[in-house]
Amino acid sequence: MKIILAKQAGFCFGVKRATQIAFEAAGKGGKTFTLGPIIHSPQVVQKLEEMGVKALENVAGMDEGTIIIRSHGAASDELEEAVRKQLDILDATCPFVKKAQEHVKNLSNSGYDVVVVGDADHPEVQGIVSYATGKVYVVASGEEAVKLPKMGKIGVVAQTTQSFENLRHVVDACLVKGGEIRVFHTICDATAVRQEEAKKLASQVDCMVVIGGYNSANTKRLAEVSAEIQPRTHHIEMAQQLDPAWFEGVKIVGITAGASTPKWIIDEVLEQIESIAKDKNR
């Protein structure tokens, strides 16, 4: 059984930067916390906890110490509260997320109604929305955007893990909703590249394994685009979840991983699949 690993599997720039900031802070000791999980990887969060860095839902209970802003960013009021309390702030917000926050703030201040394309329950989107000073709407698809009310000036940004195709559908729906529309490119390039690579790989293999946190938006999207092409797509968080039955009759297996998946987990999955392949060949 041949195994093909996607070239872009694993940490993206923003996640690599965030984890580096967090682990460096953990190594220095002291009262250090992250505002929410630093990234959507339970294994990384657990490692940080073992080093004394725990994730907090908010800064309400903090009076001193260091707070690390997660890669998904934070709501503006949480940041203001951290500043008011004079906490040491380490901002690990992904630069692409930061750009989306700034666009929303500027659009709102310029009189635009803002449309954010993404998952309303995702912390990144909740943070982005908090920078709006006027009307702001969150839509997950073009179908939802069709239901938006008429507006004057519209500004559109997207959650960084969205697909360009979904963004286009929303923009098309918004074109008839207002007299002026401004669209900003806030989708992470790494996200787009990984999704295209996953599609290509899925078309070349008999089975796909997508590695990453079940709460990771970009990993779930990788699994979705892969499954559209290769129905035998399996989303796992760790090697122990692999089922040898998945590989019955499989000659080529493709592997990709979300932007928040650590290399050591990818290596463990590779090793386990190689072991399954050896057992099949006996």
From Swiss-Prot:
[4Fe-4S] cluster binds at residues 12, 94, 188. It is an enzyme of class 1 (oxidoreductase). Pathway: Isoprenoid biosynthesis; dimethylallyl diphosphate biosynthesis; dimethylallyl diphosphate from (2E)-4-hydroxy-3-methylbutenyl diphosphate: step 1/1; Isoprenoid biosynthesis; isopentenyl diphosphate biosynthesis via DXP pathway; isopentenyl diphosphate from 1-deoxy-D-xylulose 5-phosphate: step 6/6. Its EC number is 1.17.7.4. The keyword Iron-sulfur applies. Belongs to the IspH family. PANTHER family: 4-HYDROXY-3-METHYLBUT-2-ENYL DIPHOSPHATE REDUCTASE (PTHR30426:SF0). This is 4-hydroxy-3-methylbut-2-enyl diphosphate reductase. The gene is ispH.
